[in-house]
Amino acid sequence: MSAEVTHTGQHPETGALTRRIMGVETEYGITCMDGEVRRLRPDEIAKYLFRPVVDKYSSSNIFIPNASRLYLDVGSHPEYATAECDSLTQLINAEKAGDVIVNRMAVEAEAALAREGIGGQVYLFKNNVDSIGNSYGCHENYLVRREVSLKALGRRLMPFLITRQLISGAGMIQHPNPMSKGEGFPLGYCISQRADHVWEGVSSATTRSRPIINTRDEPHADSHRYRRLHVIVGDANMAEPTIALKVGSTLLVLEMIEADFGLPDMELSNDIESIREIARDQTGRIPLKLKDGTTRSALEIQQVVFDHARRWLDHRVESRGTSNEEMARVLDLWGRMLSAIETQDFSQVDQEIDWVIKKKLLDRYQTRGNLGLDDPRLAQIDLTYHDIRPGRGLFSVLQNRGMITRWTTDEAINHAVDHAPETTRAHLRGRILKAADKLGAPVTVDWMRHKVNRPDPQLVELSDPFSPVDAEVDALIAYMEAHAETYRT
């Protein structure tokens, strides 16, 4: 292929976007414990968590200098939405930076509680289900072209997304919950935390029916050119390679659909029934009914998609987005994971895939203590795996001991804590926010609109999420600098 890709990463011959804007929204579970005693309600802890934010910005819904969004979501869940990223490793750094940022807030909240004579530690969990069965999300966002029908795209994507839990689930011990709307599944280990909490395939709702794909038309970009694919079904992941496989495989599938690369129609007869069954089948072999009357297993569906993706890499034209080298790493892990499921020998991925890592940990404790799967000590291990506090959460302990494979580095993650991605619109937002923070200028910011409120309102709208340069932003920052004295009075 000789034609060059555009600045958006779209190849003129295949139509595939190999440079794609994407982001992840993570809701965190929250509690405060003093020993085994719960000290405060989640809404009370959340107030302490966000008090410094509200004191500084007069709001609990803000954009921060690394261009990400930080806010308090429904149900008192702290939520962190990464800035716009255009490559896989950049996104992993941005997502992991969110863990660092909210953990720092938790440490500060503990200090504030102690000053008021309230003991206890604040716990933030990067998981998807609390102890009484309430679910909170980890949502992925992918930019697609406006001419793409999200419903049609969703139908093509659905078999992959429903079976993707096999390769990227977070894993959990599933306890029967009489309070849930579930189907009465028995005690067992599930490979996905989110599978039981979606109720539709494609829908414009997010909380009422929790679809696998949300179709609300909110592109946060030029609405004449782009749509935003909002994937709700994914688990929140701790291991960097699991995040890479979850997002990287999805990028490859989107590219193949856009390029019409010959993925066969494997539309499932019942999406919701299938996703529940797969979550409880670590072999991936339960036959699933397809709409064409045939059956395939989840493992077979993933293998078909993987085989096409491996061939696609030979045709994929590199852009400034995710490199072919990164995608080769994704395919290597994807292939090894499918082989592990096929052979039921998970030793080749037991330092990379969350649900496998956690199950190995639980199995070891269960065997050592001769424990039943419903033993509270195993439930504690299950939960503590997701505690984001370094040195306290089990995941971080394993990673510090070299028992978890890294995809990126602490240095890159810490850089992303304070710096916006440099290759997208996020860079411009970060520049504006840092200048405003330094000068004390009052600004109002969202994904597209950036406004300096005084002395005279100045508004810049950035509709191209791919562009990290803009003369109007330069002028806006110059305006703030010219009125620095105004902001000091």
From Swiss-Prot:
Entry's EC annotation: 6.3.1.19
Keywords: ATP-binding, Ligase, Magnesium, Metal-binding, Nucleotide-binding, Ubl conjugation pathway
Coiled-coil annotated spans: none
Binding site for ATP: 69, 82, 447
Signal peptide feature range: none
GO terms classed as biological process: modification-dependent protein catabolic process; proteasomal protein catabolic process; protein pupylation
Record field: catalytic activity: ATP + [prokaryotic ubiquitin-like protein]-L-glutamate + [protein]-L-lysine = ADP + phosphate + N(6)-([prokaryotic ubiquitin-like protein]-gamma-L-glutamyl)-[protein]-L-lysine
InterPro entries, per database record: Pup_ligase (IPR022279), Pup_ligase/deamidase (IPR004347)
Pfam families associated with the record: Pup_ligase
Recorded metabolic or biological pathway in which this protein acts: Protein degradation; proteasomal Pup-dependent pathway; Protein modification; protein pupylation
GO function terms (MF aspect): ATP binding; ligase activity, forming carbon-nitrogen bonds; magnesium ion binding; ubiquitin-like protein transferase activity
Highest rank taxon of the organism: Bacteria
Residues involved in Mg(2+) binding: 25, 71, 79
Catalytic residues, chain numbering: 73
UniProt keyword Ribonucleoprotein, yes or no: no
Role: Catalyzes the covalent attachment of the prokaryotic ubiquitin-like protein modifier Pup to the proteasomal substrate proteins, thereby targeting them for proteasomal degradation. This tagging system is termed pupylation. The ligation reaction involves the side-chain carboxylate of the C-terminal glutamate of Pup and the side-chain amino group of a substrate lysine.
Family per similarity comment: Belongs to the Pup ligase/Pup deamidase family. Pup-conjugating enzyme subfamily.
Note in the entry: The reaction mechanism probably proceeds via the activation of Pup by phosphorylation of its C-terminal glutamate, which is then subject to nucleophilic attack by the substrate lysine, resulting in an isopeptide bond and the release of phosphate as a good leaving group.
UniProt name for this protein: Pup--protein ligase
Gene from which the chain derives: pafA
